[in-house]
């Protein structure tokens, strides 16, 4: 009560921020006549003047008022678009490193130009991040004219650019590109072998468009660069053939071989399922007749079974993926776009390929990985724009330290958001949607229908075709035409069906796109085209504007709001309504019981709908539950990735320092001394008697590891007073002398090149193996909870031990190679480098997260061998240890049954 009163008197924090910004807007408006009086040349020279002032000690904020006035005037002259006052406020919020929430149609693309120009002045580069290549190209081309007029260069980063094109784009003052391309370029740069192979500069300032889509929706899915491992495609086909013999358990605890947990998106084998699958695998010769699936040696077979079960039970064709040209292509659940080249991890993609009977491609090994949370936190300053961020304001603040500021619209919103209509079945719901569409078409009202999957969009399209209603379909299968379809979706009576609208980036203008009409028309007919467009625009406005129909609720309220936000732009009239049924996934999983009881009480008949605040509240509560769960997943992923992130920073820093250095001989010397010190300590324990020394073992390990034969025993026999410190010093001196002789024989320059090449290759190989080990550790770490230990703390502890172990192994391997390998010329070193840097077929994954363990998935399961050898056919797995029954006590000592403890790892 008191809080409301205070807010009423002094305003909310958002109100106070906007109020402060309006004072700056006033100053910019006062400058407008002065700036408008400048010639084009004088206006363009302002950039040089601003840069000079920065070098003389002024700050970006000191220049803000004048710089914004200059950009506004340049935009008026070049683009014929003048920034509104609220757009200036939005850009100020971006410059502060905050998120500006601006409704659809408020001109976010133009807002970005102000903050991008101002932050590009220091010459460190400014990145504008969009959600797809089309928008990156469009915005770079469109706004590049404005930046060029002011003397700034513009680049664009999209897929299929070569290294030199990327380097040129990143060298520009302002670079447009997609979040995935920026992230993958960062990872690729940290896999480069020389500094001149890198393309990015140090991250300085980024403006993220559709920030909620990129930093929240896609934050559950890490970016992974991976390469192929052993070919096991035959196993996927064999296991896939077993799945149709299993029956699904209709309700938990009932008969059936597997249970599907739709909330967690997981599939579990039941008791009878284990027995059935074991019997089938014995018949197929995949395991021996006396083998159990839970024998330690067979546990990795569960990887293939789980992947095949998920592929059949959880992943549907035309919903989660499409099949095109013999390939399984993932469909992005947030945007409805097809994503060629992307692959699921954990063997899931291979299982889906086997299910669809298309060629199965190899599994992958992680070469480099980062989450969007950790990538975007590398920037000195980060800002974002979106139409819907307020529902996730707490998460933005908690994870990224970003505050959300709601920018008032230029014109008041007059859209009519009607209540949800709930039907008993999907059939009744679609019938009602078709009636609503027909009514709108008859009255000349444009309609946009949002669906959550390609399957539903095609189902609705089929119903409309039967009803004789002309319409356009916009989904992942037709995205080449999507910009054109959306541009014309505002014509009177136009019907457009679209999968999830997040990130489409093209405004729906009532009457259709005038720019597109003019682009395709004869210039002599321009006036007639404008008159026809005005007529269509007025007709669409008179009919009530764009009507948005939601065919079901998304699991996030924010994405529902994005769909609604397509209507009512810049004060236009509009309306929206969601049609739901008890068969919709969200209703079925989270809200059906309460709503079904309510419907029974009201005695609803077929074809009738219910519209009630209780229903809307029940649905919103269901969405909040899902949002909270997804937030937990993202938070958990970040906590686990932070451990890897600290290690990633160390390794990437080491690589950069290595590439920068011309001479690493001092580093090699320090490593050699460290390795010899460790060998010595293992065989000559500190403060021990000479009788306890393993001199023979020490001589052997030094000869084996660094190729140096030393008469240590003879030294001790000849010099009885030789104590351990002096002995270690002598060993190090001998090793240094032998290495110096080798350098002299080969040549200093050749040896320096050789040392650097070896160090980089060993570091990279060790890091790849370490990433795989971290993946495997993360997969099973949740089992520590059974032993009353905190999995996160255990993960941190073990990951640290693994990392220090990796660094020690790197040192030992480097010393061994540079000491033992014989090189004779620079050509030999270069040949060795080329062999180590064979171009590998890389895959760029935006992998889905495992909902069960709330972690980043591994790129591949642990394999027993490397390479590309194809097995000769079915071969039984041979048990090496004692058989553990599923109901026997677990060998770990927890007291639980094996199936309930470490047996669950499978």
Swiss-Prot record:
Its cofactor is Zn(2+). It catalyses: ATP + H2O + cellular proteinSide 1 = ADP + phosphate + cellular proteinSide 2. Its EC number is 7.4.2.8. CDD domains: DEXDc_SecA (cd17928), SF2_C_secA (cd18803). Zn(2+) binds at residues 890, 892, 901-902. Residues 553-563 have a biased composition (Basic and acidic residues). It is found in: Cell inner membrane; Cytoplasm. The keyword Cell inner membrane applies. GO terms for molecular function: ATP binding; metal ion binding; protein-exporting ATPase activity. This is Protein translocase subunit SecA. It comes from Methylococcus capsulatus (strain ATCC 33009 / NCIMB 11132 / Bath). The lineage of its organism: Bacteria, Pseudomonadati, Pseudomonadota, Gammaproteobacteria, Methylococcales.
């Amino acid at each position: 009560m008191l809080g409301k009163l205070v807010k009423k008197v002094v305003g909310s924090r958002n109100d106070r921020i906007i109020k402060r910004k309006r004072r700056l807007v006033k100053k910019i408006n006062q400058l407008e006549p002065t700036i408008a009086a400048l010639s084009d040349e004088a206006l363009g020279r302002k950039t040089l003047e601003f840069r000079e002032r920065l070098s003389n000690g002024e700050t970006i904020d000191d220049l803000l008022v004048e710089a914004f006035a200059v950009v506004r005037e340049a935009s008026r002259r070049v683009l014929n678009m003048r920034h509104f006052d609220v757009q200036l406020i939005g850009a100020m919020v971006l410059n502060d490193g905050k998120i500006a929430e601006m409704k659809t149609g408020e001109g976010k693309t133009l807002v970005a130009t102000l903050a991008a120009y101002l932050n590009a002045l220091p010459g460190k580069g400014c990145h504008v991040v969009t959600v797809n290549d089309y928008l990156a190209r469009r915005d770079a081309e469109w706004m590049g004219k404005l930046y060029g007029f002011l003397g700034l260069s513009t680049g664009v980063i999209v897929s299929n650019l070569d290294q030199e094109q990327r380097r040129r784009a990143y060298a520009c003052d302002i670079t447009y590109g997609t979040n995935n391309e920026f992230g993958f370029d960062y990872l690729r740069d940290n896999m480069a072998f020389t500094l001149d192979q890198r393309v990015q500069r140090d991250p300085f300032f980024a403006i993220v468009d559709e920030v909620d889509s990129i930093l929240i929706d896609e934050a559950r899915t890490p970016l992974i660069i991976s390469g192929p491992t052993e070919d096991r495609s035959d196993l996927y086909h064999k296991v896939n053939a077993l799945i149709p013999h299993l029956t699904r358990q209709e309700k938990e605890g009932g008969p059936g071989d597997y249970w599907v947990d739709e909330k967690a998106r997981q599939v579990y084998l039941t008791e009878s399922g284990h027995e059935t699958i074991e019997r089938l695998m014995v018949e197929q010769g995949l395991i021996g007749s006396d083998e159990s699936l839970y024998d330690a040696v067979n546990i990795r077979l569960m990887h293939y079974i789980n992947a095949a079960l998920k592929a059949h039970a959880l992943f549907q064709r035309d919903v989660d993926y499409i099949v095109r040209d013999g390939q399984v292509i993932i469909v992005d659940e947030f945007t409805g776009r097809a994503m060629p080249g992307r692959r699921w991890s954990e063997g899931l993609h291979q299982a889906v390929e086997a299910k669809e009977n298309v060629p199965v491609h190899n599994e992958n090994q992680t070469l480099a990985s980062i989450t969007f949370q950790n990538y975007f936190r590398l920037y000195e300053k980060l800002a974002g724009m979106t139409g819907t961020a307020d529902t996730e304001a707490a998460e933005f603040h908690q994870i990224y330290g970003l505050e959300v500021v709601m920018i008032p619209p230029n014109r008041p919103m007059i859209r009519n958001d009607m209540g949800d209509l709930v039907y008993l079945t999907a059939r009744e719901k679609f019938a009602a949607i078709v009636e609503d569409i027909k009514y709108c078409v008859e009255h000349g009202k444009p309609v946009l229908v949002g669906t959550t999957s390609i399957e539903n969009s095609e189902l609705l399209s089929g119903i409309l075709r039967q009803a004789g209603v002309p319409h356009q379909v916009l989904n992942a299968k037709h995205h080449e035409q999507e910009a054109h379809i959306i541009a014309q979706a505002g014509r009177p009576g136009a019907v457009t069906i679209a999968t999830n609208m997040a990130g489409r980036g093209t405004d729906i203008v009532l009457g259709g796109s005038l720019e597109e009409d003019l682009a395709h028309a004869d210039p002599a007919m321009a006036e007639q085209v404008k008159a026809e467009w005005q007529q269509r625009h007025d007709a669409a406005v008179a009919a009530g504007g764009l009507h948005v129909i939601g065919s079901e609720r998304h699991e996030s309220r924010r994405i529902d709001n994005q769909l609604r936000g397509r209507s009512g732009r810049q004060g236009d009239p509009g309306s929206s309504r969601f049609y739901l049924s008890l068969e919709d996934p969200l209703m079925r999983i989270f809200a059906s019981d309460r709503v079904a009881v309510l419907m029974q009480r009201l005695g609803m008949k077929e074809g009738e709908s219910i519209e009630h605040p209780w229903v809307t509240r029940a649905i919103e509560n269901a969405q909040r539950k899902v949002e909270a769960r997804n937030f937990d997943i993202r938070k958990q992923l970040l906590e686990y990735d932070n451990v890897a992130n600290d290690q990633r920073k160390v390794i990437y820093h080491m690589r950069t320092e290595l590439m920068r250095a011309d001479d690493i001989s001092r580093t090699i010397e320090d490593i050699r001394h460290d390795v010899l010190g460790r060998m010595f300590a293992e065989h000559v324990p500190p403060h021990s008697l000479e009788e306890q020394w393993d001199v023979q073992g020490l001589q052997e390990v030094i000869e084996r590891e660094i190729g140096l034969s030393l008469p240590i025993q003879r030294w001790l026999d000849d010099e009885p007073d030789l104590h351990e410190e002096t002995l270690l010093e002598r060993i190090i001196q001998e090793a240094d002398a032998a290495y110096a002789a080798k350098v002299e024989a080969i040549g200093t320059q050749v040896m320096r090149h050789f040392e650097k090449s070896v160090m980089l290759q060993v570091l990279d190989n060790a890091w790849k193996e370490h990433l795989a080990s971290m993946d495997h550790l993360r997969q099973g770490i949740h089992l520590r909870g059974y032993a009353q230990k905190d999995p996160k703390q255990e993960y941190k502890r073990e990951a640290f031990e693994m990392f220090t172990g990796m660094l020690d192994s790197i040192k030992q391997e480097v010393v061994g190679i540079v000491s033992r390998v014989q090189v004779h010329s620079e050509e030999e070193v270069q040949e060795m480098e080329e062999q180590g840097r064979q171009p590998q077929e890389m895959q760029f994954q935006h992998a889905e997260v495992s909902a069960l363990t709330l972690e980043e998935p591994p790129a591949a399961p642990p394999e027993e061998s490397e390479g590309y050898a194809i097995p000769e056919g079915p071969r039984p797995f041979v048990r090496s240890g004692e058989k553990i029954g599923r109901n026997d006590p677990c060998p770990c000592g927890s007291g639980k049954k094996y199936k309930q403890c470490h047996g669950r790892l499978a």
